[in-house]
Amino acid sequence: MSTVVSEGRNGGNERYSPQDELPDLENLKLTDDMRVPSFDRLPSPTPRYYGSCKWFNVSKGYGFVIDDITREDLFVHQSNLNMQGFRSLDEGERVSYYIQERSNGKGREAYAVSGEVEGQGLKGSRIHPLGRKKAVSLRCFRCGKFATHKAKSCPNVKTDAKVCYTCGSEEHVSSICPERRRKHRPEQVAAEEAEAARLAAETAASSPRGDHDD
């Protein structure tokens, strides 16, 4: 750190450093008005209120509680519930909470929701929603199975030719499969066979005829 010569001290012969202006940190002691307050002793943002769960939708993750004093319906979201794992409330469950205005302006909501004793965990609902399927099953028209693959990438059929997805045969397609006669109603099978015959006749009529010898 640079030093300068003070002109007003000892006829300009005393050396002076800006560090001389810093307080003596070694002997500095905190006074009561300088101490950092303990957050454990800070007052709560609002009074603690008490009520009961009116209803709670476990699938959507929200519901309402009824305040004991005002009988007001207060919105409650699962993210404000003091519990581990799947968070929900059981109908009629006793709770304590703070109250604040909702961010969307639609009334008030309960937050920091716990049991009747502040910080106590909640029991939660006995109903849990069914888990969502991780994959959607589609029917592959090449192998006929319900799976997550598509026909163009079917792992069950090794040939590029059309196959019957009812029985897997390469000799015919599903519309004229003998297995369908056994599994479906006779009138449905008859209609499908008639349609298949009509298509075959149209194909034969449109095919070029070869020259025949007399």
From Swiss-Prot:
Residue sites binding Zn(2+) 1 per the record: C140, C143, H149, C154
GO molecular function: enzyme binding; mRNA binding; zinc ion binding
Residues noted as binding Zn(2+) 2 in the record, renumbered to the chain: C164, C167, H172, C177
UniProt superkingdom: Eukaryota
GO cellular component terms listed in the entry, alphabetical order: cytoplasm; nucleus
Function comment: Heterochronic protein which controls the choice of stage specific cell fates. Regulates the timing of the second larval stage events (L2 events) in the hypodermis.
Similarity remark: Belongs to the lin-28 family.
Gene3D superfamilies: Nucleic acid-binding proteins, Zinc finger, CCHC-type
InterPro entries for this protein: CSD, CSP_DNA-bd, Lin-28_RNA-binding, NA-bd_OB-fold, Znf_CCHC, Znf_CCHC_sf
Protein location: Cytoplasm
CCHC-type ZnF: 139-156, 162-179
CSD domain: residues covered: 48-116
Native source species: Caenorhabditis remanei (Caenorhabditis vulgaris)
Keywords in alphabetical order: Cytoplasm, Developmental protein, Metal-binding, Repeat, Zinc, Zinc-finger
Protein name as catalogued: Protein lin-28
